[in-house]
């Protein structure tokens, strides 16, 4: 059998390794100059006014919601078709997640469904940029402005994505992820981008115990006067070991995303006559980051269900993924919201399959996946 082909693998090279070695030898390995470099470089790359590095996108979402005062009695509108951490953070703050349906073919929310879910208790809207494509931000921003509700963009999949002539993260408040499978990775990490001065200052405090400065600032400035806790906060800062990797990855992002684009194009060309159904790309102007390449496996079209197809791929040494099982179908939320029915979300949740896509893949790897799919589906195809 050929070597196992995972659905994702981080593109880590000698530059990232050397950056970590330099930090380890610097005498300062926690939050420090590499964090500052990452935040500065991110703002320069994407036109952000403020960038605040954190230990994960989940942490970033948590303290952003906190900074906006989200709490008991509040409602936050977001899709169920997302990683469950966003829903968890809303619930842990005592607020109510109002989960809405998605477009069947792009997996993203539309403004009409968001508007229909707004009540007097709505305190935030969290759309998700999916698989590397952007939401229709103009329509969403118009709704948010009309009702004076904060918009928090979940861009865990969308570093290097453009909406029209703007980068995702250039305007408003946006949460990015640097998790191991993301387009930029530092193993674990995230970043909050915002053009709101007050929000930026607040999340910077909340990420580090509620202090006005971090440990590196206090070392440089000395400990007199002693830094004070302005408000209770968390330990969500990013170490410089992680930040150093992200700095290099950010420099490499154009080549990383270009390779992802080429691989996605090869998949699309090869699957044009397949009963598998790739996600649609939005019809508005955008630049896709191709974080994931996803297909829908419909048994009526393919003669085999998604789970069986994934098992067969594994048997021939090919990994695949599920991004994601809808949040409201998870045990806790299924029991909490037993009557919630989101048709497009549920249809996709039962059929989504993520195929291998990462920068170090060869064209022949794509061909191997496509050939395996044809072999598996061939005898079953309806």
Curated annotation (Swiss-Prot):
In terms of Pfam families, this protein maps to: DegT_DnrJ_EryC1 (PF01041)
- Kindly list the GO molecular function terms attached to this UniProt entry: pyridoxal phosphate binding; UDP-4-amino-4-deoxy-L-arabinose aminotransferase
Q: Which GO terms describe its biological process?
A: lipid A biosynthetic process; lipopolysaccharide biosynthetic process; response to antibiotic
Under catalytic activity, the entry for this protein gives: UDP-4-amino-4-deoxy-beta-L-arabinose + 2-oxoglutarate = UDP-beta-L-threo-pentopyranos-4-ulose + L-glutamate
Q: Which keywords does UniProt give here?
A: Aminotransferase, Antibiotic resistance, Lipid A biosynthesis, Lipid biosynthesis, Lipid metabolism, Lipopolysaccharide biosynthesis, Pyridoxal phosphate, Transferase
Q: Which residues carry this modification: N6-(pyridoxal phosphate)lysine?
A: 182
Assembly and binders = Homodimer.
Protein name, please? UDP-4-amino-4-deoxy-L-arabinose--oxoglutarate aminotransferase
- Organism of origin: Yersinia enterocolitica serotype O:8 / biotype 1B (strain NCTC 13174 / 8081)
């Amino acid at each position: 059998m050929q070597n196992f082909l995972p659905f994702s693998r981080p593109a880590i090279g000698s530059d990232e390794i050397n950056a970590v070695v330099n930090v380890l030898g610097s005498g300062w390995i926690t939050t420090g100059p590499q964090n500052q470099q990452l935040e500065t470089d991110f703002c320069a790359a994407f036109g952000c006014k403020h960038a605040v590095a954190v230990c994960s996108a989940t942490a970033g979402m948590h303290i952003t919601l906190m900074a906006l005062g989200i709490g008991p009695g509040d409602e936050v509108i977001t899709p169920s078709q997302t990683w469950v951490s966003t829903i968890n953070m809303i619930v842990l703050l005592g607020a109510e997640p109002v989960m809405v349906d998605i477009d069947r073919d792009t997996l993203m929310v539309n403004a009409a469904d968001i508007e229909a879910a707004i009540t007097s208790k709505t305190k935030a809207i969290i759309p998700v940029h999916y698989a590397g494509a952007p939401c229709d931000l103009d329509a969403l921003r118009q709704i948010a402005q009309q009702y004076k509700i904060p918009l928090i963009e979940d861009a865990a999949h969308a570093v290097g994505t453009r909406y029209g002539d703007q980068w995702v993260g250039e305007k408003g408040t946006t949460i990015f992820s640097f998790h191991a499978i993301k387009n930029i990775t530092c193993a674990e990490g995230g970043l909050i981008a915002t053009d709101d001065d007050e929000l930026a200052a607040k999340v910077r405090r909340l990420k580090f115990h509620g202090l006005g400065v971090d440990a590196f600032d206090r070392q440089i400035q000395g400990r007199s006067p002693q830094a004070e806790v302005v408000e209770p906060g968390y330990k969500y800062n990013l170490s410089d070991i992680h930040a150093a990797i992200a700095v290099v990855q950010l420099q490499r992002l154009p080549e990383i995303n270009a390779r992802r684009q080429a691989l996605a194009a090869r998949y699309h060309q090869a699957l044009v006559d397949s009963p598998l159904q790739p996600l649609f790309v939005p019809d508005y102007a955008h630049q896709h980051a191709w974080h994931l390449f996803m297909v829908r496996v419909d048994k009526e079209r393919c003669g085999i269900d998604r789970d069986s197809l994934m098992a067969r791929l594994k048997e021939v040494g090919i990994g695949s993924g599920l991004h994601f099982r809808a949040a409201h179908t998870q045990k806790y939320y299924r029991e909490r919201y037993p009557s919630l029915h989101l048709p497009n979300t549920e249809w996709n949740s039962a059929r989504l399959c993520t195929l291998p896509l990462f920068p170090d893949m060869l064209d022949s790897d794509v061909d191997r996946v496509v050939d395996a799919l044809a072999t598996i589906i061939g005898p079953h195809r309806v």
